[in-house]
């Protein structure tokens, strides 16, 4: 689905945190979708997040919507350079009849850290695909998620971690509440 996002994407957002900069307040990206009366609607949000060495950012990405009959197909690419830390909170709270597919590609360098938290509630189908590359020693990834599901709602979490070198750490923990 990342290829479909690339094919239909017209614009996106770029966030770059400079070397040695600690952003003191969380940054929120709010994706708002609405269904169409005349037929299905697809949105293709795209974000590129780049943390330079020794920087820090808390990022909240939230998906909400009105109506029904829409599909969100998002891609987020995150590059975390040496000694940088990204705390990434992804909240999927689309409407009950929406579908939300997301692809997160995370690239970590030496002694960098990614702390990811994903929450899902109220959406018919959510599919998160997280692919992480631990490319240099000391890189650390922690990914946690919780889904609160009712009736026919579904949440699918796919995680692939590439331990490219020694002395890297990854942890993941997901729970579903039905």
What function would you assign to each model-found segment?
Residues 1-178:
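Conserved beta-strand/loop scaffold segments within soluble protein domains that form the structured core
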């Amino acid at each position: 689905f990342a290829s479909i996002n690339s094919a239909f994407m017209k614009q996106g957002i770029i966030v770059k945190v400079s070397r040695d900069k600690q952003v003191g307040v969380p940054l929120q990206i709010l994706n708002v979708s609405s269904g169409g009366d005349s037929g299905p609607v697809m949105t293709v949000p795209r974000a590129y997040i780049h943390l330079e060495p020794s920087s820090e950012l808390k990022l909240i990405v939230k998906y909400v919507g009105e109506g029904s009959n829409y599909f969100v197909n998002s891609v987020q690419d995150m590059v975390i350079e040496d000694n940088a830390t990204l705390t990434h909170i992804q909240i999927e709270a689309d409407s009950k009849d929406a579908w939300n597919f997301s692809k997160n590609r995370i690239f970590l360098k030496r002694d960098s850290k990614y702390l990811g938290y994903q929450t899902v509630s109220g959406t018919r189908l959510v599919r998160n695909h997280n692919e992480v590359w631990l490319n240099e020693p000391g890189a650390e990834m922690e990914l946690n998620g919780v889904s609160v599901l009712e009736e026919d709602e579904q949440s699918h979490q796919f995680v692939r971690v590439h331990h490219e070198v020694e002395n890297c750490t990854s942890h993941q923990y997901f729970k579903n509440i039905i």
